[in-house]
Amino acid sequence: MFVDKTLMITGGTGSFGNAVLSRFIESDIINDIKEIRIFSRDEKKQEDMRIALSNPKLKFYIGDVRNYKSVDEAMHGVDYVFHAAALKQVPTCEFYPMEAINTNVLGAENVLSAAIKNKVAKVVVLSTDKAVYPVNVMGLSKALMEKLAIAKARMRSMNETVLCVTRYGNVMASRGSVIPLFINQIKQGKELTITEPSMTRFLMSLVDSVNLVLYAFEHGRQGDIFVQKSPASTIAVLAKALQDIFGSKNKIRFIGTRHGEKHYESLVSSEDMAKAEDLGDYYRIPMDGRDLNYAKYFVEGEKKVALLDDYTSHNTRRLNLEEVKELLLTLNYVQEELKNA
């Protein structure tokens, strides 16, 4: 599907960028692809990736999604875009809301507009469960990003730039997530700081995140949102699982919820569940393709919103301690940390 094509990954030196590049290299997709453009702000991370991967198919572009010109210049000749650049730390976004808006909303606008201008065939935008019923700035900014993508998709046919969205749960061991924090605290002999023990989160691996984006890329139609069905765990069980894996007896200290945190997350709202298509491992949420001429819908009638629950980390499959340990031990990050323990 990428034969002789050019792919651009915004925020390409982050957790997702590293994961998708590893997949391409291990599966030999890299041999078929014409070029992969890594677009990001951090020259040090680009240099580290350049040295670590040392592949002539990788081209590096310094730039910021906030700057339309840099995005536009990097996108000349690009066939496909994975838009992963974002500010994603919930407390940070609470304190600096305009920074979140500038990157997650206006930056996305720049990426989508440049893709349309440069006649990119397909863009897959990476979103988050926090965009569903958002209560924090990060979730609000990602919800607006989704709305931007869908609004632009609504005005385009399948023969033009196709815009679709993937919505993630918690990606385990991604940069800035709780698993690296707990492991560092365990190895340093510190107390494990738990916000709220009964808080639940979806558990999704970096491998899952790549699978979701590639599935959306292959199957996505104009304005689609794709969600992967994922199990969940309480924060307390996750911490205990890591303690058991590392043979730790560190004390646990409860610190209370941080700025902007929710007790549980939702991946699909009850409103979207009414129109979601169950694809086995995934949900596909088609866009609402109606225009602003509402009069005809009053005459023709409107599909009733189904009385369904939203799909949340509280009502999905809940993993017990042994299941969480088994899942954690499949992660390369945890395996490497165990070797270095």
Curated annotation (Swiss-Prot):
One of its GO terms (molecular function) is UDP-glucose 4-epimerase activity. Its EC number is 5.1.3.2. It holds the Pfam family Polysacc_syn_2C. GO terms for biological process: lipopolysaccharide biosynthetic process. It is an enzyme of class 5 (isomerase). Signal peptide: none annotated. It catalyses: UDP-alpha-D-glucose = UDP-alpha-D-galactose. Belongs to the polysaccharide synthase family. Epimerizes UDP-galactose to UDP-glucose. This is UDP-glucose 4-epimerase.
